[in-house]
Amino acid sequence: MSNSDLNIERINELAKKKKEVGLTQEEAKEQTALRKAYLESFRKGFKQQIENTKVIDPEGNDVTPEKIKEIQQKRDNKN
């Protein structure tokens, strides 16, 4: 299991416990930290995926949004 999978598993365990019996202060802090770390990781991965996407219409024209093209161009110029 990856670290992300373990974090999701623990987040789910804490969510279930919260519904059933409640969480201690320490568990609530852990839940908040795990959720924050998960969201940061998700957003980073999603951003990378979007920034590496090229949109082509049925006629074969590149219709990638200009904002994405600008980000890709800046990234490519750095390398």
From Swiss-Prot:
Identify the keywords attached in UniProt to this record, alphabetized.
Cytoplasm
Which segments show compositional bias classed as Basic and acidic residues?
64-79
User: One GO cellular component from the entry?
Assistant: cytoplasm
Q: Please, which domain of life does this record's source organism belong to?
A: Bacteria
Is the keyword Cytoplasm assigned to this protein? yes
Tell me where it mainly resides.
cytoplasm
Pfam families per UniProt = DUF896
Q: Where is this region: Disordered?
A: 56-79
Cell compartments where the protein resides: Cytoplasm
Q: What PANTHER family does the database record attribute to this sequence?
A: UPF0291 PROTEIN CBO2609/CLC_2481, UPF0291 PROTEIN YNZC
Q: Which family does it belong to?
A: Belongs to the UPF0291 family.
Designated name of the protein? UPF0291 protein SAV1341
